């Protein structure tokens, strides 16, 4: 009888170090998260106004093994019980990815266990399966983060069709760069969203790029320019109107994300949506998409709020689901294999 598999997942693609343990049942049912631990580098990078790759890599080195110990203790498991060691193969910062790959390969070799490199975006895409109400295939997925904004048709694990993507800045970049223009510090997206709650979203008429383009692509670079222009026009009035400009900026970004997602639903004929990635935690996005989808009779699934950011749980879950689906076999090559640039729709 084939036993369940215990999978250790390691995330180190950018500025969060995450480790998790997932149990994948032999019968193919949804894997179970046993424990996870996460360390954010936000405080370290704040002084620089953004992520410093070298510092990120060094901090991953310091954190990943202690986090592994924490997770094993929380799950009441021994390292020797791990069947597969999974890690984020890409996309991401090359040096940061190599830390996770190196630790995974070292653990795998020392335990004589296979390793499996996981696509970071597939981790986000499948993260709602960690919730109490997991989605069912097929569905439309909105992947929205600091570095990516994509609409995908998802028919199963490893069966992804790109419907549309940003042609310039990602939605998360639009939040962060607009926040920087308003002097809100790092990380900018959450700061802008908090300030927006105090403002009037109708105060400024900002563009909704590509909203009526007839396709499912996004563009946010022009919005950033419009925010800069408006901030300069306000001049000395900016401090008093900053909340209004933040609210108007957030409204423009969310409006485009929601309407493009609805268009993807109509084009595909699907009745389920998954929203994943850091921007998926945005309250306005959730409220507006929930309301619009409720009117259409469409179900919306999100990761738990604490799993919207990068984390090891999504990497362990993606590895478990790929193994269950027979999409990939783990290996004992221990090759430190990473792919800093790696389109999700190229994943078999």
Swiss-Prot record:
Role this protein plays: Required for the formation of a threonylcarbamoyl group on adenosine at position 37 (t(6)A37) in tRNAs that read codons beginning with adenine. Is involved in the transfer of the threonylcarbamoyl moiety of threonylcarbamoyl-AMP (TC-AMP) to the N6 group of A37, together with TsaE and TsaB. TsaD likely plays a direct catalytic role in this reaction.
| Superkingdom to which the source organism belongs | Bacteria
Binding-site residues for Fe cation, renumbered to this chain = 120, 124, 310
Q: What is its main location?
A: cytoplasm
Q: Which family does it belong to?
A: Belongs to the KAE1 / TsaD family.
**Any binding details for the cofactor?**
Binds 1 Fe(2+) ion per subunit.
Q: Which InterPro entries would you find in this protein's record?
A: ATPase_NBD (IPR043129), Gcp-like_dom (IPR000905), KAE1/TsaD (IPR017861), Peptidase_M22_CS (IPR017860), TsaD (IPR022450)
Q: Where in the cell is it found?
A: Cytoplasm
Q: Name one GO biological process term.
A: tRNA threonylcarbamoyladenosine modification
Q: Which CDD domains match?
A: ASKHA_NBD_TsaD_bac
UniProt keyword annotations, A-Z: Acyltransferase, Cytoplasm, Iron, Metal-binding, Transferase, tRNA processing
- Cofactor list: Fe(2+)
User: Could you give one GO CC term from the UniProt record?
Assistant: cytoplasm
Organism of origin? Paracidovorax citrulli (strain AAC00-1)
Q: Which GO MF terms does the UniProt record name?
A: iron ion binding; N(6)-L-threonylcarbamoyladenine synthase activity
In the UniProt record, the signal sequence range is none
According to UniProt, the reaction catalysed is: L-threonylcarbamoyladenylate + adenosine(37) in tRNA = N(6)-L-threonylcarbamoyladenosine(37) in tRNA + AMP + H(+)
- Residues annotated as binding substrate are 143-147, 176, 189, 282
The protein in question is named tRNA N6-adenosine threonylcarbamoyltransferase
EC? 2.3.1.234
């Amino acid at each position: 009888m084939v036993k369940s598999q215990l999978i250790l997942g390691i995330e180190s693609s950018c500025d969060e170090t995450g480790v998790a343990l997932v149990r994948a049942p032999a019968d193919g049912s949804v894997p179970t998260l046993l424990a996870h631990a996460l360390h954010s580098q936000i405080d370290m990078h704040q002084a620089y106004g953004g992520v410093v790759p070298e510092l990120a890599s060094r901090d991953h080195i310091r954190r990943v093994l202690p986090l592994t110990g924490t997770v094993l203790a929380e799950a009441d498991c021994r390292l020797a019980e791990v069947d597969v060691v999974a890690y984020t193969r890409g996309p991401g910062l090359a040096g940061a990815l190599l830390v996770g790959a190196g630790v995974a390969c070292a653990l795998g070799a020392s335990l004589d266990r296979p390793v499996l490199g996981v696509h970071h975006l597939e981790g986000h895409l499948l993260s709602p399966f960690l919730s109490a109400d997991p989605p069912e295939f097929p569905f439309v997925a909105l992947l929205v983060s600091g570095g990516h904004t994509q609409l995908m048709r998802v028919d199963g694990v490893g069966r992804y069709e790109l419907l549309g993507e940003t042609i310039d800045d990602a939605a998360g970049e639009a939040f962060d760069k607009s926040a920087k223009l308003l002097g809100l510090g790092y990380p900018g997206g959450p700061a802008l969203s908090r300030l927006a709650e105090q403002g009037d979203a109708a105060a400024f008429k900002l563009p909704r790029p590509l909203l009526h383009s007839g396709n499912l692509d996004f563009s946010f670079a022009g919005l950033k320019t419009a925010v800069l222009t408006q901030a300069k026009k306000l001049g000395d009035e900016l401090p008093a109107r900053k909340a209004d400009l933040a609210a108007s900026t957030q409204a423009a970004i969310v409006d485009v994300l929601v309407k493009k997602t609805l268009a993807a639903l109509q084009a595909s004929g699907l009745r389920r949506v998954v929203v994943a990635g850091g921007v998926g935690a945005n309250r306005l996005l959730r409220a507006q998409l929930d309301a619009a989808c409720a009117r259409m009779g469409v179900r919306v699934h999100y990761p738990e709020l604490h799993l919207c950011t990068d984390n090891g749980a999504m990497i362990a879950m993606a590895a478990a689901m790929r193994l269950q689906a027979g999409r990939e076999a783990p290996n004992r090559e221990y090759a430190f294999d990473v792919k800093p640039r790696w389109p999700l729709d190229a994943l078999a």
